A protein has these predicted regions:
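Long, low-complexity, serine/threonine- and charged-residue-rich intrinsically disordered N-terminal tails
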Residues: 14, 28-32
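Single conserved hydrophobic/aromatic residue that forms the stacking wall/gate
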Residues: 263, 268-272
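Short N-terminal or domain-adjacent regulatory/targeting segments
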Residues: 1-20
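A short, charged/proline- and glycine-enriched loop
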Residues: 20-26
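Residues at the starts of beta-strands that form the adenosine-phosphate
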Residues: 25, 55, 136
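Glycine-rich beta-alpha loop elements in corrinoid/cobalamin-binding modules
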Residues: 33, 41, 60-264
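Short helix-loop-beta junction
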Residues: 44-56
Length: 272
């Protein structure tokens, strides 16, 4: 079967022009190659956004060295940037359990192992924030979802803060993102403020204590602070237990964790 370039989500400026687009609503950056198949999460989310009327492009495996031309080639989106490390956790994908670099990457052309950096969620977001500081960046994928609170990093053998702190992203869409990314796009398209977006389920974000939506509530789960977890292993274990328990509830409770002078807030998941 013959396919045209316009049958796929655009990855270059030329492909956008073939569709008659002079502006994009959302630009997705992925640590994987772009394959229009359900095995590749960025492709799924791109197609879902497209089906909801948004102009979407994907930048697969951008070059993070040099002049960052891959991050500039499509310009700034109207709504936001989406960043995903790929279908697998990038560190598991790049390294063995003995911390030796793998010789192949199953999600890259020709199985090349040098097509993504360590922690692409952090690297890509820091570059985007340097180039477009006023454009919101939403993290997604397994890498961000598993690092949405203080977490033990096996590769560096240390307890690290939520990935929002290291990356500088505005929020995390954790878990399965098909529903939340459309709601996020709709919210930005309607001109909603970041405070209003913070009320959405499956969104993790940082804010000052005075800016926590609705303030502290009786049914909130207050996690041990990051600073406390650095000296209290049981506190970290309790945090992870709460995270796992709430992730499997039909009606989850909001979780809040203090990190330095800010608070990480994780609203509830969607009700089924």
């Amino acid at each position: 079967m013959d396919y045209k370039l316009t049958d796929f989500l655009p990855t270059t400026k030329k492909e956008c022009e073939l569709r008659g687009w002079d502006e994009l609503d959302v630009i997705l950056f992925s640590g994987d190659a772009y394959v229009d198949h359900p095995s590749f999460g960025a492709a799924i989310l791109g197609r879902i956004l497209e089906a909801n009327g948004y102009r979407i492009a994907i930048v697969p495996q951008p070059d993070w060295h040099g002049d960052f031309r891959d991050f500039k080639k499509l310009g700034r989106p109207r709504l936001f940037f989406g960043v995903s490390p790929g279908a697998m956790d990038s560190m598991v994908n790049r390294y063995t359990a003995n911390r030796r670099m793998r010789s192949e990457d199953a999600f890259s052309p020709d199985s090349r192992h040098d097509m993504r950096p360590d922690y692409p969620s952090i690297v890509y977001t820091q570059i985007l924030k340097k180039l477009y500081p006023d454009v919101p960046v939403a993290l997604g994928g397994i890498e961000a979802s598993l690092r949405r609170i203080s977490h033990y990093d096996y590769w560096k053998d240390e307890l690290r803060k939520c990935i929002l702190c290291d990356s500088g992203a505005d929020l995390i869409l954790y878990g399965m993102g098909e529903r939340s990314i459309v709601e996020l796009a709709n919210a930005f398209a309607e001109g909603k403020t970041m405070d209003q977006i913070h009320e959405m389920p499956q969104v993790a974000f940082y804010c000052k204590e005075k800016d926590i939506p609705g303030g502290f509530k009786d049914d909130d789960i207050i996690l041990h602070s990051h600073e406390e977890c650095l000296h209290n292993k049981k506190g970290q274990a309790e945090n992870v237990r709460h995270l796992e328990e709430e992730a499997n509830k039909m009606h989850a409770q909001r979780m809040i964790q203090a990190v330095s002078y800010t608070h990480l807030t994780l609203p509830t998941i969607y009700s089924v």
